[in-house]
Amino acid sequence: MPFSLGQRWISDTESELGLGTVVGMEGRMVTVLFSATGENRLFSRSEAPLTRVIFNPGDKVESHDEWSLTVTEVEEKDNLIIYHGIHSETGEQASLRETLLNHNIRFNKPQDRLFAGQIDRMDRFGVRYQCQLLRNKLATSDLLGLQGPRVGLIPHQQWIAHEVGQRFAPRVLLADEVGLGKTIEAGLIIHQQLLTGRAERILVIVPDTLRHQWLVEMLRRFNLRFSVFDEDRCVEAYADNDNPFYTEQLVICSLELLRKKKRLEQALDADWDLMVVDEAHHLEWSEDAPSRAYKVVEALSEVVPGVLLLTATPDQLGHQSHFARLRLLDPDRFYDYPSFLKEEESYKDVATAADALACGESLSSEAIASLTQLLSEKDISDSINLIQDASANADKRNQAREELLQELLDRHGTGRVLYRNSRASVKGFPTRNLHIHPQPMPEQYVTASRVSAMMNKHLDTNAKVRQVLSPEKIYQDFDSGSASWWKFDPRVDWLIDFLKTNRSKKVLIIASQAETALSLEEALRTREGIQATVFHEGMSIIERDKAGAYFAQETGGAQALICSEIGSEGRNFQFASHLVLFDLPLNPDLLEQRIGRLDRIGQKNDVEIHLPYLAGTAQERLMQWYHQGLNAFECTCPSGHILFGEFSGELLETLTTDDESSLETLLDNTKSRYQELKVAMEQGRDKLLEINSHGGERANKLVESLAARDEDTQLIGSVIRLWDIIGVEQEDSGENAIVLHPSEHMMFPTYPGLPEDGITVTFDRDMALSRDDIALITQEHPIVQTGLDLITSSETGTTSVAVLKNKALPAGTVFLELIYMADASAPKSSQLYRYLPPTPIRILLDKSGNNLSDNVTYESFDRQLSAVNRHIASKLVTASQAILHPLFAKGETFAANELKLLTETAREKMTQQLTGELERLKALKAVNPNIRDEELTHLSEQMSELNRYLDSSQLQLDAIRLVLVSHA
């Protein structure tokens, strides 16, 4: 290389050093000073990884005195370059020697990097282009926010999330029956609101005992890092902000914290976009005396735009409490309880008409008259005639039914604010089978219980019941906690025999106390060497994950997982179908929670419930009350909460005595009341509301679309290639899983979201659902998003040179492939990306400036190309400069025309969609007051705002590939 003192060069391997100056030459070595960092580097003159920097006419260069020159002429004198052109400050002719160029010059623009010899490997150009295409594909997805979460594709859950998550500031009540996944629905809505920019700051209010469960659920299922706030955390946060709630965007806290006046005031002032309240049915309300908890949530609901209330079904707790929750969502709409009851009467006509449509049979004359009256502002005679015509096309008849059902729903008083699914309306649940295993009461327990009864006569009934339900605890307490009760307890003998007989089965065992769970694990291990693991509240999240993963492993994993009551909250193990209840909780809801660990949508087998109990004891009497009175083992019992409240006094008394007649009376009374409540709930079912809540055929199609995207092999290939380019270590761990590790050779110093100790990932949803320790990789996963951002926000792949070996073309023929990005700067919350996301525009020019991109696809062109080394690539660029400069100008003209078309299409799509939605909501508002004025105003303002953003759309050259034909 011909070096001279004062010449400016740039490092090919360390561009961050800036512009270097040749300051010394001695023998075969050259010294270059990089003034930006103050570093001297010594290079071999023959193999220096340096590129000479020479600008061209039209370029703008900056002097070290910080004035700039627009170059009109380039002169070389004594091996040094002198630039002539227009002075930026005076507007007059000026000259600038290359020695006086600003040493902080960076070559960020692709064409500058190309001419400066900073040329990337060819595969990086391809990865960059694919990254831009993936970002565009995600932004334009109509399912944005639904694919990424690690949840099963359950139609009613996805439907509710799709319907609610797309709204501006949604205010809804999620009131599904237990086991149908309200938490998942809320998580999907939160995830969708965050990804679409509709919400940024979210507050989740939960009972104290559920804070940890929500934290785990949001992280493991939705990749959302919430922070749990308690009083200690609030005090710590003062160092960063006077209002502790401003220190995090995503916060989980308990109602107890917000009962404090100071904390409530801070929460009210924290500018939340969305508030989620779990267990909202515990907010007590009456017109005269609302509870403190209710007032706290009410105050927040007045200042937070979006509100999600998760609650028990309205049937469970009565209409007044149901009205109280609706009042939190829209106090102007639900202002008076008597008026609400009166309005509800009118819903019955709508629901009856919906039943007639939903059953799929011909309509009676009464149903036709009712439908005609309810939809009097429309002529529905054609639809009615089509439904009644048995010879008509079945699909068309069903479509007519769907359309009329939708019309009815729009008139339903709470159709847009209340979602409630019941097991009666949702398919996919397994059968529950109870197997009882009575065991004799050991003499050791009889003696311990007799002594305890004499010593603890002062105990209240609740304490006595807790004791008689857990005789092993009484026995252990008498021996300072060191007694090995499991050596003689017949329930343990039965459990060991059961596990030995069913060695191929996964078995979940639940006990009330962590101590009991630990003792059982010791018994199984020491007596028979049975592989079991424990799961209790004293373990960390990571320890619980490892225990869950060990249990989930098909080969070499634990046969049994032994859980405590609290430790199992929020964890589901659908891959197992055998449940052993080592004892019973004194609460129907807790019993349902236990069974619900296995009895969930997605369970592929019947749930076999095994109950070993001590015969003739309180355990047997409690089992009888649950089984004969509530049928709580083999069916869900929505009225369990009410029945326990009504009969708890008699039940507790019965458990502490041996009075058979009082037990029979209790069972008869409970059974009778259970049937009454069951009939009342069935009659109170609102079929129209259920149709809206589970989505019907529309929900099934939504899930089919999501499932199809899970099978996108092109995405899998693109993501793995992305990790290859970045330098992430990938190790196949079998079972469709890959272990990712940061490597020493990564292109970037850090990869946010990729742990130092690695992460196990899979593209298989079923695998991810069965293993808590494996992340589900979709295009929405933060690791993928971060990878895309690392590439597209850096200079990686912005320049490339390749050779096309094709003897049908003259040697030396030049092609210039340009990737432009069409974009418009706008906040995420504007939703502009739905119409004009960052869009790559590919232009392929021949040397005459003809655009060949329509005829030559990227894939077919890329397959024919071969890479060249950087040294040769730099020479090819230098030799082609005269051809390239005019081609860049032509490329921009073609891209500008494409941008114009994209903008016009985006504007048409936006206007059509938003105008249609605005007109629909205005029409609905005339018949359904649940359409809020805020929604209409927001749509009108959004249209004006989006038009302004579209007017400012612009082009940016993102990447260049120079291709030359070779016959070699």
UniProtKB/Swiss-Prot annotation:
<keyword id="KW-0010">Activator</keyword>
<keyword id="KW-0805">Transcription regulation</keyword>
<dbReference type="Pfam" id="PF18337">
    <property type="entry name" value="Tudor_RapA"/>
</dbReference>
<keyword id="KW-0067">ATP-binding</keyword>
<keyword id="KW-0547">Nucleotide-binding</keyword>
<dbReference type="GO" id="GO:0016817">
    <property type="term" value="F:hydrolase activity, acting on acid anhydrides"/>
</dbReference>
<feature type="domain" description="Helicase ATP-binding">
    <location>
        <begin position="163"/>
        <end position="332"/>
    </location>
</feature>
<comment type="function">
    <text>Transcription regulator that activates transcription by stimulating RNA polymerase (RNAP) recycling in case of stress conditions such as supercoiled DNA or high salt concentrations. Probably acts by releasing the RNAP, when it is trapped or immobilized on tightly supercoiled DNA. Does not activate transcription on linear DNA. Probably not involved in DNA repair.</text>
</comment>
<dbReference type="InterPro" id="IPR027417">
    <property type="entry name" value="P-loop_NTPase"/>
</dbReference>
<dbReference type="Pfam" id="PF00176">
    <property type="entry name" value="SNF2-rel_dom"/>
</dbReference>
<feature type="short sequence motif" description="DEAH box">
    <location>
        <begin position="278"/>
        <end position="281"/>
    </location>
</feature>
<dbReference type="GO" id="GO:0006355">
    <property type="term" value="P:regulation of DNA-templated transcription"/>
</dbReference>
<dbReference type="GO" id="GO:0003677">
    <property type="term" value="F:DNA binding"/>
</dbReference>
<dbReference type="InterPro" id="IPR014001">
    <property type="entry name" value="Helicase_ATP-bd"/>
</dbReference>
<dbReference type="Pfam" id="PF12137">
    <property type="entry name" value="RapA_C"/>
</dbReference>
<dbReference type="InterPro" id="IPR038718">
    <property type="entry name" value="SNF2-like_sf"/>
</dbReference>
<keyword id="KW-0238">DNA-binding</keyword>
<dbReference type="InterPro" id="IPR023949">
    <property type="entry name" value="Helicase_RapA"/>
</dbReference>
<feature type="domain" description="Helicase C-terminal">
    <location>
        <begin position="491"/>
        <end position="678"/>
    </location>
</feature>
<dbReference type="InterPro" id="IPR001650">
    <property type="entry name" value="Helicase_C-like"/>
</dbReference>
<protein>
    <recommendedName>
        <fullName>RNA polymerase-associated protein RapA</fullName>
        <ecNumber>3.6.4.-</ecNumber>
    </recommendedName>
</protein>
<dbReference type="GO" id="GO:0004386">
    <property type="term" value="F:helicase activity"/>
</dbReference>
<dbReference type="InterPro" id="IPR040765">
    <property type="entry name" value="Tudor_1_RapA"/>
</dbReference>
<dbReference type="InterPro" id="IPR022737">
    <property type="entry name" value="RapA_C"/>
</dbReference>
<comment type="similarity">
    <text>Belongs to the SNF2/RAD54 helicase family. RapA subfamily.</text>
</comment>
<dbReference type="InterPro" id="IPR049730">
    <property type="entry name" value="SNF2/RAD54-like_C"/>
</dbReference>
<keyword id="KW-0804">Transcription</keyword>
<dbReference type="InterPro" id="IPR000330">
    <property type="entry name" value="SNF2_N"/>
</dbReference>
<keyword id="KW-0378">Hydrolase</keyword>
<comment type="subunit">
    <text>Interacts with the RNAP. Has a higher affinity for the core RNAP than for the holoenzyme. Its ATPase activity is stimulated by binding to RNAP.</text>
</comment>
<dbReference type="Pfam" id="PF18339">
    <property type="entry name" value="Tudor_1_RapA"/>
</dbReference>
<dbReference type="GO" id="GO:0005524">
    <property type="term" value="F:ATP binding"/>
</dbReference>
<feature type="binding site">
    <location>
        <begin position="176"/>
        <end position="183"/>
    </location>
    <ligand>
        <name>ATP</name>
    </ligand>
</feature>
<dbReference type="Pfam" id="PF00271">
    <property type="entry name" value="Helicase_C"/>
</dbReference>
<dbReference type="InterPro" id="IPR040766">
    <property type="entry name" value="Tudor_2_RapA"/>
</dbReference>
<keyword id="KW-0347">Helicase</keyword>
